Amino acid sequence: MNIKSLLLGSAAALVAASGAQAADAIVAPEPEAVEYVRVCDAYGAGYFYIPGTETCLRISGYVRYDVKGGDDVYTGSDRKGWDKGARFALMFNTNSETELGTLGTYTQLRFNYTSNNSRHDGQYGDFSDDRDVADGSVSTGTDLQFAYITLGGFKVGIDESEFHTFTGYLGDIINDDVISAGSYRTGKIAYTFTGGNGFSAVIALEQGGEDVDNDYTIDGYMPHVVGGLKYAGGWGSIAGVVAYDSVIEEWATKVRGDVNITDRFSVWLQGAYSSAATPNQNYGQWGGDWAVWGGLKYQATQKAAFNLQAAHDDWGKTAVTANVAYELVPGFTVTPEVSYTKFGGEWKNTVAEDNAWGGIVRFQRSF
């Protein structure tokens, strides 16, 4: 009996001790669920949700290397060797939905390296040749090329002028602006109305910017003004823009038509007129009162596209360029291009040679 009581008492003591230890034990919290990156397919391929938000982000860019030879078709000068250029561009897009429409941003950073012909006439570096032209140079630079915000149809920030973007660029050509259709980068506030029937309209207030050695920014509170109308359908599109340069108090206009002949072959034609017959302005930078551009694109195969552009202005400059863009593998395109410029009329006395032939090969990896 005493042994039984002893055993029962020992068991009770052990149970009590176990309960006390359990009461003192630290209970580890349940691990929080890990929030993995989610794919966002509302705005196209490549977007994902920024963790903890409903904002979609896409990161993209390209690495490019250009090799140029022959003449400079913009100036008529002989390169006397190879010119090289490299660029790394990094782009960020964000989008989210609000009660006022889609709120978006776009930024692009460019890291550039250029190396001009560094050895000819027996000299090196920054010496000059017999024409007092620099014997060679290397330059690097970093630019915030684009940085703008969009909300519905509104856009504000650093972008390219609506004088270019609304009508469309001058073909899929590298040397596309030998005859310039206006300056590009500018600060602006713009609104684009897009109807459901293919009709759209734009109005923009622009600051202007620097282009090569010229400054076309406004000199007071009055901005440059751009307005345009467009109609687009399955057959193509027709668009027109009018721009007022507040510095020289003159205007310029462009009208462009695009036609899709087939799903692989398209053509386009653009005409322009300026009230000031000088290239030294923000918009009408061709020579004289008028200029015309035209081109075509033919998708020869799934990998190869042929592009052609021709242009002529009132002062007598003629430019023709052709290339073949070949996608070697997905994301990597090689583009050989040949350009010719005839400097006639009033351009003839501004260049060393009347005729210029130049070539370029571009290697570009896009991601």
Swiss-Prot record:
GO terms for biological process: monoatomic ion transport. Belongs to the alphaproteobacteria porin family. InterPro entries: Porin_alphabac. Consists of 16-stranded beta-barrel sheets, with large surface-exposed loops, that form a transmembrane pore at the center of each barrel. The pore is partially ocluded by a peptide loop that folds into the pore lumen. The keyword Membrane applies. It is a multi-pass membrane protein. Keywords: Cell outer membrane, Ion transport, Membrane, Porin, Signal, Transmembrane, Transmembrane beta strand, Transport. GO terms for cellular component: cell outer membrane; pore complex. It comes from Brucella ovis (strain ATCC 25840 / 63/290 / NCTC 10512). This is Porin Omp2b. It comes from the Bacteria. The gene is omp2a. Residues 1-22 form the signal peptide. Homotrimer.
